[in-house]
Amino acid sequence: NFEETYETIEQIGLLTNRLPEAKKINEDIQMKLEKLQQKVENVEPKSVFFVVGVQPEIYTAGKGTYMDEMLSFLNIKNEVTEPDWPSYSAEDFIASEADVILTTYEPDIEALKANPLFATMKAVQSNQLILVDGDTTSRQGPRLAEGVESIAKAVYPELFNE
């Protein structure tokens, strides 16, 4: 989670005799996150299905995951209510009413678009299958704010038309 990320950055700073720099990194992350949260706080929440793999079943980021925390932070509803990394059958996936489907792996987008079973899904029909950077959205570290921002821009692009 975010707190563990901050703690890890400070622990590394402590171990490398660079605690002031580590604290500055955390301050910068928190400042960027605060700005992002302010951008999305009054927006109508969208729902997301965050796909992390499509073979042989559809795997997704569930409750309590780092990705789920990013979604919650951004006023985004995670369509997945199960904890951890549950798998979904095609039938259960189709039943999803997600506004947006995110993934970190480009071939997954092509696989989802190519499967006629998924053609009726809201996110597929509205072409809301979006690739986000896997390094920043699935790995905890000093690029936390970049990952959160990439999700925010993918789900709420209208807020970033500057």
Segments (PLM) and residue ranges:
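Flexible, active-site-adjacent loop/turn segments at secondary-structure boundaries
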Residues: 56-59, 83-86, 110, 116-122, ...
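Alpha-helical, coiled-coil/dimerization segments enriched in small aliphatic residues
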Residues: 59-86
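Solvent-exposed helix-coil-helix hairpins and adjacent flexible coil/strand "hinge" segments
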Residues: 40-55, 69, 94-109
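Short, well-ordered secondary-structure micro-motifs
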Residues: 37, 59-63, 113
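Acidic/His-rich segments in extracytoplasmic proteins that coordinate ligands and/or metal ions
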Residues: 1-15, 87-125, 131
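Extracytoplasmic substrate-binding proteins
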Residues: 1-55, 77-82, 127-162
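Short, glycine/charged-enriched secondary-structure capping and boundary segments
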Residues: 10-11, 62-66, 115-118, 144-146
